[in-house]
Amino acid sequence: MRRMSLLLIFVLLAGCGGGYFKVPKEEYQARVRTLGVLPLLVDERASLRHPDEGLIFELLQRENAGKEELLVEELRAQKAYFDVRRIDGHPQDLFYGLVRGSSLGGQGKTSYRRYAFDAEAVRNLTDGHVVDGLLVVVLNGLQRPEKRWDRTRLKYLEADYSAIQVSAAVVTPTGEVIWEYPSPPGSEFLPLQYPDFDEAHYNMAEAVAIKDISVKGLRRALQERTGGLLGKGKDPLLYRKLFSDLAGQLQPATFQLPGKTAAEPAPPTGSQARP
């Protein structure tokens, strides 16, 4: 009975994560032993609802450059794959070559942008780099209901806010998405707006205005670093937090009963088989 209770707890914890597997985890492990990681992509077709949209797209492209190395590092540290390989390429060329279309999933607070991929383009990349699947991370603009607090944590304003959200997927050579990260509520990567509680307070106004964060403020947020162990403090905080979350979710053998340890992924024999 105690064993069954522990199993139920672990299953419930698995359902609380931001990402989810669209096939059984055992099947995922068998199909994706070597994972390819693309540069961070930016969806410039999704409106940011910000007056400086063009400058923000440029800022994201500039700050994203090379950051996928940190994600590869996080994934390798988890030891959930036989190998994790970086895939080179120009981010915008990759986006327009790979992405066949997008649609909105969920609703309200859980809405997110879902992407479909061109199977031939995916196959060319997986064959060329000898990987079983691609991890595609797309930064995109989305407006959805969020609850934002003032600095005292005593007041909040729930409204529609624009933000940079993250949609991620593991795609097989056939174009099938077998793992998805749907940007869960409260996980916005970079808020683009804020409620001005101070203005309302000093003007003795009941209405709280929603204002746009400046490009300079967004750049500071993307570049913010904190002290840390093992040299991690030199990395931008927002990116490190995102990659740690993604790597933690992308472990097909994460949820083990106490006393059990996950087996190391078996190396592929000969050339890697594809589904």
Question: Where is each model-derived feature located?
Answer:
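C-terminal/domain-edge helix-coil "capping" segments
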Residues: 17-36, 45, 144-147, 158-165, ...
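N-terminal post-signal-peptidase region of extra-cytosolic proteins
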Residues: 20-21, 56, 115-122, 149-156
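C-terminal motif of bacterial Sec signal peptides marking the signal peptidase cleavage site
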Residues: 12-15
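Generic short beta-strand segments
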Residues: 40-42, 138-144
